[in-house]
Amino acid sequence: MDQPAHAPLRLWVTRARPGAEATAARLVSMGHRPLISPLLAIRRLRPRLDLTGVGALAFTSRNGVAAFAALNPERALPVFAVGDATAETARQARFRDVRSAAGDVAALAALIIAEPVEGAVLMAGAREPAGDLPGALEAAGVQTRPAMVYAAFAASGGRGLTALRAGKLDGVLIHSPRAARRLTGAVGGGGLAHRSSA
């Protein structure tokens, strides 16, 4: 039997559920050993969504798509998605007209600006968004309507922190700036640098 080209890495997946499971499955398929221990937890909010005057939807994450889809049956409005994974989530939720910026918030803003929308762009996203999509769009004269459909809350990450402190990890996967801040706050900047250099 052939030996693997490399030893499996022990990797802490800090991503919130349910995305953490997909990341872990991919790591397993690559021969690694993931440890799921989220630093953030996603909670859907229940805002009243008024789509009057809305000409398109914008999503900066898969969580935004899932939360909006659970709140509202609208699927005919054009959807602008930050990346391919978010676009695929929108298609799976039965949105009919989905376009991917295949990038970041700046790329998403550029895509929306390049394809004029009649009416406002409703941005269904996090209570504390990572980027300033409304600012970029409004600077270009695009009407925006933010809708906070989910929030990320701190989770303990206890199992991951314990494994990190015990030197039982080869790496840590961080999926957002907020999770990175949470991790450095939990272990201290110097402690993280020391452990990650091992």
What are these regions (language model features)?
Residues 1-198:
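Signature of uroporphyrinogen-III synthase
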